[in-house]
């Protein structure tokens, strides 16, 4: 049952990430038949902030998932030990 909650949580986070992702459009800065001389303009701030937040979010999810997995493994080991002894 806990695995179902984990999968549901990951699915919700995935959908929210897609919904709140910044929209990106390619815009021509010059005439397509102009010379090869030009300049490049980049806006890396938006991508860097979005990626950093996503990394923290994935880190938190990974910690929770590891905690849940550790609890499940401990419970399974305790049940096996109880079966072996009793």
From Swiss-Prot:
Propeptide stretches in the record: 27-52
MF terms (GO), sorted A to Z: toxin activity
Keyword Transmembrane: no
Residue ranges that the Swiss-Prot or TrEMBL entry lists as coiled coil: none
GO cellular component term, pick one: other organism cell membrane
GO biological process, one term: defense response to bacterium
Signal peptide: 1-26
Cell location: Secreted; Target cell membrane
Pfam families: Pilosulin (PF17499)
Leucine amide found at: 85
UniProtKB keywords: Amidation, Antibiotic, Antimicrobial, Cytolysis, Membrane, Secreted, Signal, Target cell membrane, Target membrane, Toxin
Tissue-specific expression: Expressed by the venom gland. This toxin is detected along the entire venom gland, as well as in the venom reservoir, the venom duct and in the venom. No toxin are detected in the Dufour's gland.
Membrane is among the record's keywords: yes
Other known facts: Negative results: does not act directly on human Nav1.7/SCN9A voltage-gated sodium channels.
Similarity section: Belongs to the formicidae venom precursor-01 superfamily.
Function: Toxin that may interact with target cell membranes, producing a concentration-dependent leak in ion conductance, possibly via multimeric pore formation. It produces an immediate sharp increase of calcium concentration in all DRG neurons. This influx in calcium stabilizes without resulting in any observable dye leakage, showing that the effect is not simply cytolytic. This toxin may be one of the major contributors to the pain associated with envenomation. The toxin also displays a weak cytotoxicity (on HEK cells) and some antimicrobial activity (MIC=2.5 uM on C.neoformans (var.
Name under which the protein is recorded: U-myrmeciitoxin(01)-Mg1a
């Amino acid at each position: 049952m806990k695995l179902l909650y984990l999968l549901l949580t990951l699915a919700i986070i995935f959908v929210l990430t897609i919904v709140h992702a910044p929209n990106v459009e390619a815009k021509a800065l010059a005439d397509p038949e102009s010379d090869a001389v030009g300049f490049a303009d980049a806006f890396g701030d938006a991508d860097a902030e979005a990626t950093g937040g996503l990394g923290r979010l994935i880190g938190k999810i990974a910690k929770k998932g590891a905690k849940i997995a550790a609890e499940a493994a401990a419970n399974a080991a305790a049940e096996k030990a109880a079966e072996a002894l009793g």
